[in-house]
C-alpha cells in the first residue's frame, strides 16, 4: 500500500470505531469546548489501533500535545499509526513487527516530548521513565495504567519504594474490568483464535489458564462455542468459582494431557512449560491472552523442537518429535496480534475512564503511588453508557436512602 492508501485505510477504521464509541464522543465534545488539557503534553504507550486512536484524538481535542508508541511489537496497525501521525498535535512512533530495541526507541521518542501525564498499557513507559529517563520525573503530574499486568508491576514498584509518581489504576475501575476484561477479552480472544486457525471449537477440550476476569470471559465464550472447558488456577477461591460455574478444574499438568486448545490469561509467566508440551495431544493449539509473551515458555518449546515452520498466517508449528504444537502469534497477545482487539463498544468505557482520569490528574495534585479511579468517574461512565443504550434505571427514594444509612430498623 502507498502512504496515502495507508492513511485512508486508517481513517476508515477510525471512523468506524468513532461511530461505535458514544461515551467518549460526549467526553470529546466537552473537551473541545473546555480545553482542560491546554498546554499539557501526554505521552502514551498503548496498542495502536482504531479505538486507541479515538482516545488519542479526544486528548488532543482537549488541548494536549500527544505522542504515542506501541505497547506490544505485534499489536500496532500501521495504517492507523500513519493516519494518527497526520493529525495536528499528535505524533505516532509505533510500527508493527518492530524488534525489542526499536520498540524501546519508540518509547524514548515519546518521552522526548517531556510529558506531563503518561498513559501506559503494561507499564513499559513508566519502567523506562524510572530506569533511564529519571530527569523527567519531577515534571510528571501523574499517569494512568490500562491493564492488569501493568497494575501488578506498579504495585510491586510501590511496595519497593521505587514508584516516584502518582498513577491511576484505570484497570481497576468497575466500568473497565467488569466489561473490558470479561466481555472484551472473551470475545476478542476467540475472534483472534478463530480467524487465525479456522478450526471448529465445538466438541474440543479447551484449557483456560487462570480464572480472573479475563479467564472468565474466555471460558464463558468457549462454552458458548460448544467446547468442553477446563480451568486451571492457583487461587482456591477462583478455582471453586470456576467449578461452580460448571467447568472442570484441575492442575495444568493434568489438563495438558487433555487440551486441544490452550488459552493463557493469568498475567504471570511459565503457565505452559516443557513438562506440559511433552504430554500435549498432537496438534494442540496454544494462544496467550495475557499482556506479555511470557505465559507460554517459547524458549523451552523452541529448544524441544526438531523443526519449526509456518503452517498458516500467524501460526507456527513446533515439531517436538512425537507430536506437533501450534502457537498463534508467537505467544503474544492473541486478540491484538491476531485480531483487531476488543469491540469498540467495550473500549468506549475503558478509554472514557482514561480520558477522564487524565483530566483528573491535570486538575488535582496526587501523592506518589497507585490510586484507584475516583468513584464519581466510574459511575459517570456507567451512566453515560446506559444513556447511549437508551436505558433508564431507578433511583433511591429518600426513605430508601435513610433506611440504607440507618441502623434502628430491625425485625
From Swiss-Prot:
Annotated localization: Cytoplasm
Gene3D superfamilies the record matches: Adenosylhomocysteinase-like, NAD(P)-binding Rossmann-like Domain
UniProt enzyme class: hydrolase
Catalytic activity: S-inosyl-L-homocysteine + H2O = L-homocysteine + inosine
Residue positions binding substrate: 121, 146, 176, 180
Cofactor(s) this protein cannot do without: NAD(+)
Database matches in CDD domains: SAHH (cd00401)
Principal location: cytoplasm
Keyword line: Cytoplasm, Hydrolase, NAD, One-carbon metabolism
Residues noted as binding NAD(+) in the record, renumbered to the chain: 147-149, 181, 210-215, 233, 268, 289-291, 335
A Pfam family that the UniProt record links to this protein: AdoHcyase
GO CC, alphabetical: cytosol
Keyword Aminoacyl-tRNA synthetase: no
InterPro entries for the chain: Adenosylhomocyst_ase-like_sf, Adenosylhomocysteinase-like, Ado_hCys_hydrolase_NAD-bd, NAD(P)-bd_dom_sf, S-Ado-L-homoCys_hydrolase_CS
Entry's cofactor comment: Binds 1 NAD(+) per subunit.
EC number: 3.13.1.9
GO MF term set: adenosylhomocysteinase activity; trialkylsulfonium hydrolase activity
Biological process terms in GO annotation: one-carbon metabolic process; S-adenosylmethionine biosynthetic process; S-adenosylmethionine cycle
Remaining remarks: SAH is a product of SAM methyltransferases and is known to be a feedback inhibitor of these enzymes. As a result of this inhibition, organisms have evolved efficient enzymes to metabolize SAH via different pathways. The pathway found in methanogens differs from the canonical pathway, it uses the deamination of S-adenosyl-L-homocysteine to form S-inosyl-L-homocysteine for the regeneration of SAM from S-adenosyl-L-homocysteine.
Function: Catalyzes the hydrolysis of S-inosyl-L-homocysteine (SIH) to L-homocysteine (Hcy) and inosine. Likely functions in a S-adenosyl-L-methionine (SAM) recycling pathway from S-adenosyl-L-homocysteine (SAH) produced from SAM-dependent methylation reactions. Can also catalyze the reverse reaction in vitro, i.e. the synthesis of SIH from Hcy and inosine.
Family, per entry: Belongs to the adenosylhomocysteinase family.
The protein's name in its UniProt record: S-inosyl-L-homocysteine hydrolase
